[in-house]
Design a protein with these regions (language model features):
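N-lobe entry segment of adenylate-forming
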Residues: 1-40, 44-59, 63
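Conserved AMP-binding/adenylate-forming
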Residues: 38, 53-98
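Conserved AMP-binding A3 loop
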Residues: 41-43, 154-180
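Conserved pre-ATP/AMP-binding loop-to-beta segment of ANL
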Residues: 141-158, 165, 189-195
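Conserved AMP-binding/adenylation subdomain of ANL enzymes
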Residues: 177-195, 202-263, 268
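Gly/Ser/Thr-rich phosphate-binding loop
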Residues: 235, 241-245, 253-315, 328
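Conserved ATP/PPi-binding loop(s) of AMP-dependent carboxylate-activating enzymes
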Residues: 322-325, 333-357, 377, 392-396
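AMP-binding/adenylate-forming catalytic core of the ANL superfamily
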Residues: 340, 346, 369-463
């Protein structure tokens, strides 16, 4: 938690227009956004945001109209998002990997009026059924922030998790800003003293809220690595003190540190905040050996990314932490329900799915099976949609079987699922090894190692939960945009 003197300096700001005004006044001359070549202060950024607002207003847009953004995680993309939302319009950050036909499809589905595009993507949006502008465009004059209600829609994010088809989750201003404030609550001093390298896409709620809006809330410096592939060359230049990354990226960074040394990360990295997927305790331990604190948490797009955070990882490494302030949670038949300012408005154009997830009195049904310990720390047990139903009627969570496997340092990822063997139902596991841990060992030794590991884990499990079929993969799993292992292999 923040020191008391810093906690007194931050407050809940319910809308993006108020937020943009506040950060300009609060952090005016501190460095705000940088691409490692050019660095802009908060005052300069807010002036550019005001000019982008004026440009958008010149198109005759109405409050609530939708503006899409297609770019890498650049300073211009951040400024355009702030401009769209502080002008009273609704921002949609499109994933940079979308093929041209999907971009056009999104424009049609969401009724997008303006599409702001980064230079690398201009060719891909020819024929878009809306006005297309360069993301760098600004007007000569400025425009004031709009007046909006905290419950007005601010942004739409794609969500689908590891199983379902993508949906458009509508987040109001209050939700974005509650999520952003939750991201300020981190251990140690936070205000005006950190450098963040943005290694996540802004189309992901984790990248936009925790890795961007929370950074600005703190008066910290936000650095673009451009295309994620450029991260390797940028981190030693940026010298970040904090990173926000999904576990898949943390695994990649750890492997590179083992190859090139800690200097690869810039030499000043102290904290990594991770989420959007299970954070294995072994990963926490390996970063701790490097003097880097890795903290996990829990959140979902429908809850503006942040619901719990765990700063007590050494004594509770498998927990996702405690609830952030001003949120309620309850467990209904094993499923986590939560509500608060961070809750979404519904899925765009899908009242049926909205009714399945959001109750009339504001509770989000997460689909996650959880438990709380006596001190209020939450633990993920599994996903309702992932349950394996045995022939005897028993429900098994594959995540509960996967958990002990993740304690092994030679395993990168695994997937437990239902399968068939000799005409009967069995529990199967697919394992992706950390192949670098095996040196030049032949593949047969790798397979033998994990067959032995399965035997050891099976000895700790009830007979109905034991793994009967094992596959050791040479190729990576199919993954989601958050680099989680997809359940649909």
């Amino acid at each position: 938690m923040l020191p008391a003197e810093e906690l007194a300096q931050v407050k809940y700001i319910p809308t993006l227009p108020e937020f943009v005004t506040w950060i300009e006044q609060k952090w005016s001359d501190l460095p705000c956004l940088s691409d490692t070549v050019n660095t802009y202060t908060y005052r300069q950024v807010c002036d550019r945001v005001a000019r982008k607002r004026a440009l958008l207003n010149s198109f005759g847009l109405q409050k609530g109209d939708k503006v899409a953004i297609l770019d890498n995680s650049t300073t211009d993309a951040v400024e355009m998002f702030l401009a769209v939302t502080s002008a009273g319009y609704v921002a949609i950050n499109l994933p940079a990997m979308l093929p041209p036909e999907a971009v056009i499809g999104c424009c049609m589905k969401f009724g997008i009026k303006v599409l702001a595009v980064g230079k690398p993507f201009m060719e891909a949006v020819k024929g878009a059924p809306c006005k297309v502008i360069a993301i760098t465009d600004c007007a000569d004059q400025t425009a004031p922030v709009a007046t909006v209600d905290k419950n007005d829609p601010a942004a739409i994010f794609f969500t689908g998790g590891t199983t379902g088809a993508p949906k458009g989750a509508i987040l109001p201003h209050r939700a974005l800003m509650r999520g952003a404030l939750n991201g300020v609550y981190a251990p140690g001093h936070q205000l005006g003293c950190h450098r963040y390298a943005c290694v996540l896409p802004l189309s992901h709620v984790f990248g936009l809220i925790y890795s961007t809006l929370s950074v600005l809330y703190k008066g910290a410096s936000w650095y673009s690595v451009g295309n994620t592939k450029d991260t390797i060359g940028k981190l030693p230049v940026i010298k970040p003190t904090m990173l926000v990354a999904v576990p898949g990226i943390c695994e990649i960074l750890l492997g590179l540190v083992k190859m090139y040394g800690k200097g690869f990360l810039g030499g000043e990295l102290d904290v990594i905040i991770s989420g959007a997927a299970n954070v294995p305790p072994k990963l926490i331990g390996e970063f701790d050996e490097l003097g880097i604190h890795l903290f996990g948490g829990y959140g979902m797009t429908e809850g503006a990314n942040l619901t719990t955070g765990n700063i007590d990882v050494k004594t509770r490494p498998t927990s996702v932490g405690k609830l952030y302030p001003e949120q309620e949670a309850k467990v209904v038949d094993g499923e986590l329900w939560f509500r608060g300012d961070n809750v979404f408005l519904g899925y765009y154009g899908d009242p049926e799915k909205t009714a399945e997830t959001l109750t009339p009195d504001g509770w989000v049904k997460t689909g996650d099976l959880v438990r709380f310990d006596e001190d209020g720390f939450m633990y993920i047990v599994g996903r309702i949609k992932n349950l394996i139903i045995l022939s005897n009627g028993e429900n098994i969570s594959p995540e509960s079987i996967e958990e002990p496997f993740y304690k092994d340092n030679k395993l990168r990822d695994c997937l437990v699922k239902e399968d068939e063997q000799d005409g009967r139902q069995v529990i199967a596991i697919e394992i992706l090894p950390r192949i670098e841990e095996f040196g030049n060992a032949p593949w047969e030794e790798v397979e033998a190692y994990f067959k032995e590991l399965v035997g050891k884990v099976n000895a700790t499990l009830p007979s109905t939960h034991q793994v009967s079929k094992i596959t050791v993969r040479k190729e990576d799993f199919k993954r989601t945009g958050a680099l989680k292992v997809s359940r649909n292999q």
